[in-house]
UniProtKB/Swiss-Prot annotation:
GO terms for molecular function: phosphatidylinositol-3,5-bisphosphate binding. InterPro entries: Phox_assoc, PX_dom, PX_dom_sf, RGS, RGS_sf, RGS_subdomain_2, SNX14_PX, SNX14_RGS. The gene is SNX14. The keyword Coiled coil does not apply. It is found in: Cytoplasm; Cell projection, Dendrite. Plays a role in maintaining normal neuronal excitability and synaptic transmission. May be involved in several stages of intracellular trafficking. Residues 78-252 form the PXA domain. It comes from Pongo abelii (Sumatran orangutan). The keyword Cytoplasm applies. SMART domains: PX, PXA, RGS. Pfam families: Nexin_C, PX, PXA, RGS. This is Sorting nexin-14.
Length: 894
């Protein structure tokens, strides 16, 4: 009975547990927790839209994350590491930019922009490294690639007995699967160029890739002068030995001899501008507030970025604070303030709001508590810090993020290029516009400046709809000149001769003006080229009577204005763009094709007269400078004339067709025959575009490209045979995890006996998860030691010397041999004694020797480095996996 019970237990255990069944981690005291770094965001990140979270959001710009604009904000490192990195980047500029730039100019503006770009690139890398789980990447992906590399070395060693030929045999074993960068040094440089270009959208500031000259310069500096020497440094056997000693050394880590340095903003000192001259590309928010045209441009820029509500929140809180700080608030005022606070909470704090802004949780909780409590509690906000800190947070975003972005935006460049010649340069926004100072200088605040009014003011500025029966014309504007509507919105104040006699500071009230269109007249077109044949075009005669200045002693004024048919539609489109549509004041459908002669205009006279009269009765247009210009003689001529499309004259087009269809009489036969003969000849090869290659400031290109250590890499031609070798690339890799990797190395490299291999397979169920958890924990501890301040400074110094110290003497051969010997001894001592008893001393020596010899081959190290680099790049930039076309473009030339 006991025997059968034992058999039944064995059968049950065997059937219930298979090779895929694994016992959980049995070391409860060792728990590896992946490092999670909470990075501040401008707006909450949703599934698609970073602002509102909607999948199909058409309002906001996607991915409004902090790292997209100024990734160095809230990023701090120790001052010593920061100084070391700054020194390396300074050497990059000193060696690869200043030697030729100083011959051009001594202005530091361009170099200052380059400093910001390099800081942006380094900050993006730091943030993305923080986001990935380094131990998991090492154990799950990098070690797997290393296993494949080890198998190639083992198969190559079976073919050659002499270590001198191991590298060439391994390269032949790789066959066509050799990394494309290893074919030759020029292919390696070309690969780094393509890789750098592929990463530009993610490592450079937004829209920086639009500047072709800047991207070419940065590409050559990074690929030829930074990445190539860095990869040479990492693949150098002497460097590999140094890193191995650091990793497998069980002695206590070297303690820092000096106390830890304080944390400083990442590369802030490096990015400080060196240019002593004031730059027009640097504005303060205060300057924008003081100039109405700049404020309008800034608001339009925020609209494009999907961040108008950031400015709207700032203005709303300013108004709210001014009202709540009044002494002795009445119940009605407290009730009004409480209702406004509820709107603030619902608009900017709720997750479902499209205008939600990310605040600290305690800020949202405090605002929610007051908003949902009795209205009397609103006075507590006078002493609470929640609303003040929310305002400071949003103001910081405007000053530190969006203002610098605005200074590099197309909107601001339009202001710089056209502001001097445009009448909008010194103009003021009309009554429907918004000014930050309006909220601070206005004495009568009260209910009229509530959040609803503020929201409608901002949103009304950017409302863009098409009038019923009207078409918003293009007016023949060339590409890149699409902002003429903006210039019509921010209109002239003092160009009209009628306005010149106005009393200073006298408000204009267009509602008191009286207009009529009594008749249609003819007007000679001044744009006609020939004076004797000036075209007479029909125009509307508008009689204007101004009666709004009687209070200051002015008599009613009368004048007449002549406007063309299309000028009315220019006025309509500009008013629509700025103020939205007016349902009770609309022009009839515009005639696109057909004559616009005297009879046609006469039939439209009453409709156009009614349209203007209704516009004058709208309160929001009572002080409109645009409408006043339209009704003033010589007012805004360029606004309403320059952008008009010429009339489409079908008669002229039809009359010109027969002339074009006349039968040719052979006068063009000879050019046709010559072109035909040329088309039959094979085209001559076009000269290749010269490539700018910046490799070294002190050595010739070939000296840097072909060095003594790596020679010409594998020295393969591009058309090498494509025959597939019978190696691991044709086999399915089933190993997964550190336990499987150890079994694989034990079987392939250390040649463990069968009984030990079977025992390890049996204990895999019990210890696989435990070993892998311990490995992640161990790697994390080692990485923390490696990332200590003094060690990081040491590694950065070594990298600096490898790239820039060309004139210094390299490590002597004796020092390198001493380092290699120490590495071999450390590897021998790293193997546990229990394993040595199972496999024997001789097998241990041969196996370690095989691994050690494989690591002493520079080209093989470079192969492994590039394979690992590709994996790391895909982990740091997972967006590359989703863009198949870009990936194909990089590998198509392989």
């Amino acid at each position: 009975m006991i025997f059968w019970s034992f058999v039944a237990g064995v059968v049950t255990f065997y059937c219930s547990l298979g090779p895929d069944s694994l016992l959980p981690n049995i070391f409860f005291t060792i728990k590896y927790k992946p490092k999670q770094l909470g990075l501040q965001e401008l707006f909450p990140q949703g599934h698609s839209c970073a602002v509102c979270g909607k999948v199909k959001c058409k309002r906001h710009r996607p991915s409004l994350l902090l790292e997209n604009y100024q990734p160095w904000l809230d990023l701090k490192i120790s001052s010593k590491v920061d100084a070391s990195l700054s020194e390396v980047l300074e050497l990059v500029l000193e060696n690869f930019v200043y030697p030729w730039y100083r011959d051009v100019t001594d202005d530091e503006s361009f170099v200052d922009e380059l400093r910001i770009t390099l800081r942006f690139f380094a900050s993006v890398l730091i943030r993305r490294i923080h986001k990935v789980d380094i131990p998991s990447i090492i154990t799950k992906k990098l070690l797997k690639a290393a296993m494949k590399h080890i198998e190639v070395i083992v198969k190559a060693r079976q073919k050659v007995k002499n270590t001198e030929f191991l590298q060439q045999a391994a390269l032949e074993e790789y066959g066509p699967e050799l990394h494309v960068a290893l074919r030759s040094r020029r292919d390696e440089l070309h690969y780094l160029r393509k890789l750098t270009e592929l990463l530009f959208p993610y490592i450079l500031p937004p829209k920086a890739t639009d500047c072709r000259s800047l991207t070419l310069l940065i590409r050559e500096i990074l690929s030829g002068s930074v990445f190539l020497p860095s990869l040479d440094f990492l693949a150098d056997p002497d460097t590999v030995n140094h890193l191995l000693i650091i990793f497998i050394d069980d002695s206590p880590p070297e303690k820092a001899t000096e106390p830890a340095s304080p944390l400083v903003p990442f590369l802030q000192k490096f990015a400080e501008p060196r240019n002593k001259k004031p730059s027009v590309l640097k504005l303060e928010l205060k300057q924008i507030r003081e100039q109405q045209d700049l404020l309008f441009r800034f608001m339009n820029f925020l609209k494009q970025e999907g961040a108008v509500h950031v400015l709207q929140f700032c203005l709303t809180v300013e108004e709210f604070n001014d009202r709540i700080l009044r002494p002795e608030l009445s119940n009605d005022e407290m009730l009004s303030l409480h209702e406004e606070l509820q709107k603030i909470y619902k608009t900017y704090c709720l997750d479902e709001s499209i205008d939600k802004i990310r605040f600290d949780p305690f800020i949202v909780e405090e605002i929610q508590r007051i908003a949902e409590g009795p209205y009397i509690d609103v006075v507590k906000l006078q002493t609470m810090r929640c609303l003040f800190e929310a305002y400071e947070h949003v103001l910081s975003l405007l000053e530190n993020v969006f203002t610098p972005m605005f200074c590099h935006s197309d909107e601001y460049f339009r202001q710089l290029l056209r502001g001097a010649e445009s009448p909008t340069r010194n103009s003021k926004l009309n009554r429907g516009s918004l000014s930050l100072d309006d909220f601070r200088n206005t004495q009568k605040r009260g209910e009229s400046f509530g959040i609803s009014r503020i929201g409608s003011k901002i949103k009304g500025v950017f409302k863009s709809t098409t009038m019923e029966g009207a078409m918003l014309p293009n007016y023949g504007v060339a590409e890149g000149e699409d902002d003429f509507i903006e210039e019509g919105i921010v209109v002239m104040e003092d160009d009209s001769p009628v306005e010149a006699v106005s009393t200073p500071n006298t408000p204009r009230n267009l509602a008191a003006w009286k207009i009529s269109i009594p008749y249609v007249d003819f007007f000679e077109d001044p744009s006609s080229e020939r004076k004797e044949k000036k075209e007479r075009i029909p125009v509307f005669c508008i009689d204007v009577e101004r009666n709004d200045r009687r209070a200051v002693g002015h008599e009613p004024e009368h004048w007449s204005v002549y406007r063309r048919y299309l000028e009315f539609y220019v006025l309509e489109s500009k008013l629509t763009e700025f103020h939205g549509t007016f349902p009770d004041a609309q022009l009839p459908s515009k005639r696109i094709i057909g004559p616009k002669n005297y009879e046609f205009l006469k039939s439209k006279r009453e409709e156009f007269q009614e349209y203007l009269q209704k516009l004058l009765q709208h309160p929001e247009l009572s002080n409109s400078q645009l409408l006043a210009d339209f009704l003033s003689p010589n007012g805004g001529e360029t606004q309403f004339l320059d952008k008009i499309l010429p009339d489409v004259n079908l008669g002229k087009i039809i009359k010109s067709v027969p002339g074009k269809l006349m039968k040719e009489k052979g006068q063009h036969l000879e050019p046709f025959i010559m072109n035909f003969i040329n088309s039959c000849e094979s085209p001559k090869p076009k000269p290749s575009r010269p490539e700018l290659t910046i490799l070294s400031p002190t050595s010739e290109n070939n000296k840097k490209l072909f060095n003594d250590l790596f020679k010409n890499n594998a020295n393969r031609a591009e058309n090498t045979e494509r025959k597939q070798n019978q190696n691991y690339f044709m086999e399915v890799m089933t190993v997964e995890g550190v336990y499987d990797y150890l079994m694989y190395v034990g079987r392939v490299v250390f040649q463990v006996p069968d009984w030990l291999h079977h025992l390890l397979m049996g204990t895999r169920i019990l210890f696989k998860n435990t070993l892998e958890m311990y490995t992640d924990y161990y790697l994390q501890c080692k990485l923390e030691q490696l990332f200590q301040e003094h060690r990081l400074v040491s590694l950065i110094t070594l990298l600096r010397d490898a790239i820039f110290c060309e004139n210094t003497e390299p490590r002597s051969l004796q020092d390198k041999q001493k380092g290699a010997k120490q590495t071999f001894e450390e590897m021998m001592n790293y193997i546990p004694d229990l394993l040595v008893k199972c496999i024997g001393e001789e097998t241990k020596y041969e196996s370690i020797r095989l691994l050690f010899d494989g690591l002493q081959q520079p080209v093989l190290n470079k192969q492994l480095t590039y394979v690992l680099l590709d994996i790391v790049i895909q982990e740091l930039f997972p967006e590359l996996n989703k863009v198949q076309k870009e990936v194909t473009s990089v590998t198509s030339w392989m």
